Regions:
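Short, small-residue-biased leader/transition segments that mark boundaries at the very start
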Residues: 1-3
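Extended, domain-scale alpha-helical bundle/helix-rich regions
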Residues: 11-14, 20-27
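Residues at alpha-helix boundaries and the short loops/turns that link adjacent helices
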Residues: 14-15, 33
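Residue-level signal for secondary-structure boundary elements
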Residues: 19-20, 51
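ATP-binding N-terminal substructure of ATP-dependent carboxylate-amine bond-forming enzymes
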Residues: 29-36, 41-181
Length: 184
């Protein structure tokens, strides 16, 4: 592994996104979409992948298996088995509440999750807002309590390999990610 590959690995451990790495290393004025995907491809080629860990909601007082998950590059190993060969769907939540994006999008996300479950799908939510109903522990089969970013959503898709991704119910943030174009 060359020194630039080691720097890439260390940058991921330190919390830099593929987008930030592309912007600082490749070109601040270049084609950011293309360069972001180049960094992603190189990272995956080197096996630099996020680990999925459970959020410990009981301060280690006793063993607890929650469906609250997060991704990190700081450790290795996985706390879950992925739904790769199962019927599953990812729903992108609304993120933070703000003017123009509020509880109505959370209501849509919750309804999408409930409908998916009624149809026999394992439900996977990606959302980082603890004030939403969609992040309640019993609302979905898995909750990735993580950022709604292009990189993070693609990481979940790569690991879980869902049958589909519902983008349209979460409001502007998920709609702006253009996830569909990345997998064409």
């Amino acid at each position: 592994m060359c020194s630039s590959d080691l720097v890439l690995r260390e940058a991921k451990v330190l919390g830099f996104s593929d987008f930030q790495i592309a912007r600082f290393v490749l070109s601040p004025e270049g084609n950011m979409e293309k360069e972001n995907l180049m960094v992603r491809a190189r990272r995956k080629e080197l096996g630099i992948l996020p680990a999925v860990k459970r959020i410990n909601t009981v301060a280690s007082e006793h063993p607890e298996l929650t469906n609250y998950l997060y991704m990190t590059y700081a450790v290795q190993g996985y706390d879950v088995n992925y739904y790769k060969n199962e019927k599953s769907v990812v729903v992108l939540g609304s993120g933070a509440y703000r003017i123009g994006s509020s509880v109505e999008f959370d209501w849509c996300s919750v309804n999408a999750i409930q409908t998916a479950r009624k149809l026999g799908y394992k439900s996977i939510m990606i959302n980082y807002n603890p004030e939403t109903v969609s992040t309640d522990y019993d609302m979905c089969d898995r909750l990735y309590f993580d950022e709604l970013s292009f990189e993070r959503v693609l990481d979940v898709i790569d690991l879980e390999q869902p049958r589909g991704v519902i983008v349209s119910v979460g409001g502007q943030i998920p709609n702006n990610l253009e996830i569909g174009r990345a997998h064409v």
